[in-house]
Amino acid sequence: MSEGLYEKFLAPDEPFPLLSQRGSASEEGCLDVSDFGCQLSSCHRTDPLHRFHSNRWNLTSCGTSVASSECSEELFSSVSVGDQDDCYSLLDDQDFTSFDLFPEGSVCSDVSSSISTYWDWSDSEFEWQLPGSDIASGSDVLSDIIPSIPSSPCLPSRKKNKHRNLDELPWSAMTNDEQVEYIEYLSRKVSTEMGLREQLDIIKIIDPTAQISPTDSEFIIELNCLTDEKLKQVRSYIKEHSPRQRSTRESWKRTSYSTASTSGVSGASVSSSSASMVSTASSTGSSGGNSASNSSANMSRTHSDSNLSASAAERIRDSKKRSKQRKLQQKALRKRQLKEQRQARKERLSGLFLNEEVLSVKVNEEDHEGDVDVLM
């Protein structure tokens, strides 16, 4: 085969480039495709730039490209048959897989093995067309040529651990972090919303053997002291003695007497009006009396609520003031302890006080029998 045989493709701007040029007639048994005027085109594409571009064979599905000189020589050198009748029979069958286009070990064989994973050559991806026949046309959609690759299934999203409501959990069902968090929440709630008596009661519930001196400014709660039953008692005690519950209970006690009296008056007026049925004036008068009594009850209730809210605000201010004083005392105590530790460390490192001995001296004053005259 001559060196000029199949040396290049035609320019890519021509609509249907020929695959080969006419070869030498001296070589026997060599099939020259141009003898029959055959053209290779895509059955789905009308734009040749997607197949041949800048004299290179572009394989977009694999992301690789092979030089046209290498592919063309190996591609057409293997298509050799005995006579022209066999060539016509091969061309009429339009079975592209019957040709040994890519010999074993060639440059294009590796490409063909990778292409076979994406394209099925038996579906007549390419077809041979004779001159004068209609050109196959199709939609210019990339999905017609390159098959869709199934996407990998989406990974299941990780479920985030929701924050549990610790007020409803028993003590044994909490983790260590949740127990520490809930103890801090309870101590902050009790110290800011309750008085000294309620705090002592809660301490006695948690640790009945705890001994608290009047000078103690804080109480440390150990995690192993709490149980499910103790935590249940603490929660019920906080619910009963919280400022909001206490204010609503006191307001209910104060308004119970006024509501009882107004309900008695309204019930009497309604019964008298329903029994007599004399005129509509009596019913309107009774309804007016009921509205007046209800308005007076509402006024007394709002007045008591305002007093309770003022007392609750004052109690909260006092608790904040006490907590601030307690923090200042703790800070001063910590500062004094750090100073003593620092001084002891300095003395130990200097070595000047290793042989120190502490002696106690006591002086007994002698009682003088008589007065001493200073003027003499």
UniProtKB/Swiss-Prot annotation:
Q: Which residue stretches, if any, does this entry annotate as coiled coil?
A: 320-349
Q: Identify the InterPro entries for this entry.
A: FAM199X_fam
Q: Where is the composition biased (Low complexity)?
A: 255-300
Q: Where is this region: Disordered?
A: 237-350
Tell me the keywords, alphabetical order. Answer: Coiled coil
Q: Where is the composition biased (Basic residues)?
A: 318-337
Q: Does the keyword Membrane apply?
A: no
The keyword NADP belongs to this UniProt entry's keyword annotation: no
What is any Pfam family matched here? Answer: FAM199X
Organism superkingdom: Eukaryota
Biased-composition ranges for Basic and acidic residues?
237-253, 338-349
| Protein family (similarity comment) | Belongs to the FAM199 family.
Full protein name: Protein FAM199X
Origin species, per record, is Xenopus tropicalis (Western clawed frog)
Per the UniProt record, the lineage of the source organism begins with:
Eukaryota, Metazoa, Chordata, Craniata, Vertebrata
